[in-house]
Amino acid sequence: MKPIGYWLNRTDQALTRRMDTLLAGYGLTRIGWQVLNVVADGPQVADTDVLALLAANADPATLTDAIGTALADGWLTRPDLDRLALTADGRTRLAAVAERVAVFRELSTAGISPEEYRTAVDVLERMTRNLT
């Protein structure tokens, strides 16, 4: 049996690869989609909040690039210095991909009961707390 670290890395790589493929038709990547979702959670979000909330998902340079891409593509705007907000196009883009992401989530959890999923997440969360 392979150790948990092996499967964590393989799962993350598979999730990223499949999400990037799924989102490419919408001009997004997994990281870009995550950035839009973080900004969507508040009326205005600081860049530093995006970097902090997604620190486990990507390095600061990658996140900063994703923010820059979303700004350049018109999905985000800067209502104030160092503040981000979704544009109407950004909201439309998130809504357009929501159904596809839901199908992706079903695919990625096929054959896994809700209880098994919760157990897996709980175990990984506890392991993370043990190590931080």
Name the predicted role of every residue range.
Residues M1-L22:
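Long, low-complexity, charged/polar intrinsically disordered regions in eukaryotic proteins
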Residues R17-T69:
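N-terminal helix-turn-helix DNA-binding core of bacterial DNA-binding proteins
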Residues G68-D122:
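Charged, amphipathic alpha-helical coiled-coil/dimerization segments
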Residues A14, R30, T92:
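Short alpha-helical
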Residues V45-A46, R118-T132:
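C-terminal regulatory/oligomerization modules of transcriptional regulators
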Residues P3, W7, I31, V35, ...:
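Residue-level detector of well-ordered alpha-helical segments, enriched
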